[in-house]
């Protein structure tokens, strides 16, 4: 259920981040992480699927939440999600990284077990960084641009030939997108059904409502972190 909802977050908020990035950069921004993921090699797999999730979950869930949960569970979870999203320093990823960070934070808060959020993190990174790029390589996308132009000029045979040559890859891609869509749909249904079942408990040193934001986000360390990551994110839009 959680993985289904997570994939829905990745898809929908990723679209928001992409549109906003392109709008702010006048169409010049590129998703550097996606470009890197397309370069499938063993080291990318090791860092993206194994080491990255382990480090990030240890840092943003274990360390951050363990040190702030005494001030309020919701406060700690939102802080974990925001820090996780900003840490990526990539507007393409910020929105879905934030929501995933919140979800992973809630899972860790309720279980106090890092292995659950880490496993989900690995699955999501494997899908986006290994499985999806591999599926895309099964289809000759470079040639597709050419045959599409030829088809627009009336050369339908070129498109038919390309489809015939890439039939296996297209079939794999179709199955993948159908399964992906089904997972997103299931995740949405489960989210609606279980949203109100979320539980939060009063912490021993719960911050009063009126001072939470100032205390958590207004300190020197957090302000510095936010300013630096936002600045680097903005610079990255134009590089």
Tell what function each PLM region has.
Residues 43-238:
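Transmembrane helix-loop-helix hairpins at the membrane interface
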Residues 17-52, 92:
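His/Asp/Glu-rich metal-coordinating catalytic cores
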Residues 12-24, 196-199:
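Helix-to-loop transition at the C-terminal end of transmembrane segments
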Residues 1-2, 37, 109:
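Structural motif
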Residues 1-11:
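Single conserved hydrophobic/aromatic residue that forms the stacking wall/gate
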């Amino acid at each position: 259920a959680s993985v289904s909802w997570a994939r829905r977050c990745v898809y929908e908020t990723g679209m928001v981040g992409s549109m906003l990035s392109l709008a702010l950069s006048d169409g010049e921004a590129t998703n550097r992480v996606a470009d890197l993921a397309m370069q499938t090699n063993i080291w990318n797999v090791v860092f993206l699927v194994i080491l990255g999730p382990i480090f990030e979950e240890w840092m943003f869930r274990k360390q951050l939440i363990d040190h702030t949960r005494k001030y309020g569970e919701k406060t700690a979870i939102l802080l974990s999600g925001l820090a996780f999203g900003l840490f990526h320093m990539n507007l393409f990823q910020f929105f879905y990284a934030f929501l995933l960070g919140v979800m992973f934070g809630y899972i860790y808060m309720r279980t106090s077990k890092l292995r659950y959020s880490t496993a989900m993190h690995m699955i999501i990174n494997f899908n986006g960084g290994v499985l999806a790029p591999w599926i895309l390589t099964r289809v000759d996308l470079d040639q597709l641009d050419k045959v599409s132009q030829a088809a627009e000029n009336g050369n339908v045979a070129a498109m038919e030939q390309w489809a015939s040559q890439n039939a296996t890859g297209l079939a794999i891609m179709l199955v993948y997108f159908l399964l992906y869509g089904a997972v997103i749909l299931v995740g949405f249904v489960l989210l609606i059904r279980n949203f109100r079942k979320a539980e939060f408990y009063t912490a021993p040193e719960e911050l009063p409502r009126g001072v939470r934001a100032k205390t958590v986000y207004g300190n020197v360390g957090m302000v510095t972190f936010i300013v630096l990551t936002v600045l680097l994110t903005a610079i990255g839009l134009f590089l």
